[in-house]
Design a protein with these regions (language model features):
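Feature for intrinsically disordered/low-complexity regulatory segments and propeptides
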Residues: 1-70, 89
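Intrinsic disorder/low-complexity polar-acidic segments
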Residues: 65-279
Length: 279
């Protein structure tokens, strides 16, 4: 809670005193502040003391996701935990930047967690920063509830990285199919093979998933030959012309061939997504 007082007003900039400290606010943001005036206002400042975002914390679980607005232009160095109670349900907005900013990543990690009434709320985890609404990372599969998918479609997020850490759901696969322009999809190794297995009959794998599944599994299961073999047999159901995919595929094949000591007499060829083993 801060004591905010308008000192002088201008066409583009207002001089404002907040807890006896002077800040210069964009006139548009000041109008937004007046519009949202109340006890539950979030003021976000950059490291030069300039207000970059004004947001109301009077948001509701997922039916009207005003919370997402909070992260759009968040540049503050020292944002603390904000807790708001709505209808006796505690909804947490956890944003801890401080020393955890990783500029080269350029996004927050957002996940969905259950709240007391069984509904869902967005939760922002530390470790990342956000530059704009077009670069958001969703973690976990609960995020793919129907309303979340609708919301993401509505705000038109062009660049989205998808990190799946739990189970596969129909909504997850539907979401992936709707967003085939994903820059990349990062898959938890524990579910990579499950996705491949599921995709055999559903025919929903995209090139991005194939690449990251193969790369992740090959790298992390490099000494688990049975898993590598299962992976290679799974991806034969997928056709791709991606050089990155076949590079990973080739690494896995090479390790398997070495493992069975048939490198000199056993050649493995692949073309158009089909593996040909030739003795």
């Amino acid at each position: 809670k801060r004591n905010v007082r308008l000192v002088t007003s201008g066409i583009k900039t207002h001089k404002v005193e907040i807890d006896k400290e002077v800040y210069y606010l964009d006139s548009r943001l000041w109008r937004k502040l007046e519009q949202l005036a109340g006890p539950h206002i979030a003021l976000w400042f950059d490291n030069k003391g300039r207000l970059v975002t004004v947001t109301s914390l009077q948001w509701r679980p997922l039916d009207n996701i005003e919370l997402v607005i909070i992260i759009l232009e968040l540049l503050g160095d020292n944002v603390e935990v904000v807790t708001k109670r709505v209808d006796d349900v505690e909804l947490e907005l956890l944003v801890r930047l401080e020393d955890v900013r990783i500029p080269e990543l350029g996004y927050y990690t957002i996940a969905v967690h259950n709240v007391n009434d069984g509904s869902h709320a967005l939760r922002i985890f530390n470790g990342f920063t956000v530059s704009d609404c077009s670069n958001i990372v969703f973690v976990g599969s609960r995020i793919f509830k129907r309303r979340i998918i609708h919301y993401v479609d509505r705000v038109n997020i062009h660049r989205l990285e998808l990190i799946l850490q739990t189970d596969i759901t129909r909504n997850v696969l539907r979401f992936i199919r709707l967003h085939e322009d994903l820059n990349r999809v990062v898959l938890d190794t524990n579910i990579a093979l499950a996705i491949l297995e599921y995709s055999k009959t559903k025919n929903i794998l995209t090139r991005y998933i194939v690449e990251d599944v193969v790369e992740r599994v090959v790298d992390e299961y490099r000494d688990n030959y049975l898993t590598l073999w299962d992976l290679l047999m799974s991806v034969t159901y997928v056709t791709t012309r991606s050089n990155r995919f076949w590079s990973c595929f080739d690494r896995a094949l090479t390790r398997l061939v070495k493992f069975v000591h048939l490198l000199d007499s056993y050649a493995v060829k692949y073309r158009d997504g089909v593996v040909y083993a030739v003795a």
